[in-house]
Amino acid sequence: MKKQNSSYAQLRIGFYEIRFQNQTIQELVYEFNQLANSHGWTAERSYFSMALMNEIIRRDINVSAIVVQDDKNGLVVSIHYNPVRYDEVSKSLVTFS
């Protein structure tokens, strides 16, 4: 994990890089790493997306968007948070098929 500033953390899991845009989420990095290992997220992108979203829903994290992009280093998942309730922003979640 590299810290760019007090409100940014990132975790690289194989080809996947997960960026946490809220400093209160940084303590989840280790747990996400364990979850990724147990679910084999490096194998199937659609499964990766589903497992990630299920974990976010389970924790009732306030998410404004999940943005998934490919780059030359692999898959980049950016998770954006805001202070509204999850059910108010669930329609803005962006995933891939």
Question: Across the structure, where does each feature detected by a protein language model lie?
Answer:
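Extended, charge-rich alpha-helical interface modules
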Residues: 2-97
